[in-house]
């Protein structure tokens, strides 16, 4: 998938398609909370496999049972269709 920057209208529609995510500055961000560190780390491991598949990696933080994920395409300077796809897949993993 070749990434392209999402424009204002696309960004507005994006939030409805990926519940829980926010647009902050030039990236997508979402916080996920789990019961403990093992659950949080397991979630991160599943996400890592998706990110490797697309060769597109998030900025993220993990503090015990909390994971904060930030997605943007640095080369293009903002949020792209690839960030949207990965955010959607992350939501699917979280909902399982």
Curated annotation (Swiss-Prot):
GO BP terms in the entry: tetrahydrobiopterin biosynthetic process
Keywords, alphabetical: Lyase
Pfam families given in the database record: Pterin_4a (PF01329)
E.C. no: 4.2.1.96
One example GO MF annotation: 4-alpha-hydroxytetrahydrobiopterin dehydratase activity
Domain of life: Bacteria
Matches recorded under SUPFAM superfamilies: PCD-like (SSF55248)
UniProt catalytic activity: (4aS,6R)-4a-hydroxy-L-erythro-5,6,7,8-tetrahydrobiopterin = (6R)-L-erythro-6,7-dihydrobiopterin + H2O
Family in the record: Belongs to the pterin-4-alpha-carbinolamine dehydratase family.
Protein name according to UniProt: Putative pterin-4-alpha-carbinolamine dehydratase
Lineage: Bacteria, Bacillati, Cyanobacteriota, Cyanophyceae, Synechococcales
């Amino acid at each position: 998938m070749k990434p392209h920057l999402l424009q204002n209208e696309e960004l507005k529609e994006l939030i409805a398609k990926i519940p829980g995510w926010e647009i902050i500055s030039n990236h997508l961000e979402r916080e996920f909370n789990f019961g403990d560190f093992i659950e949080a780390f397991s979630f991160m491991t599943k996400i890592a496999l998706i990110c490797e598949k697309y060769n597109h990696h998030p900025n993220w933080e993990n503090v015990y049972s909390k994971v904060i994920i930030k997605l943007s395409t640095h080369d293009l300077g903002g949020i792209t269709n690839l960030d949207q796809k990965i955010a959607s897949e992350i939501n699917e993993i979280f909902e399982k």
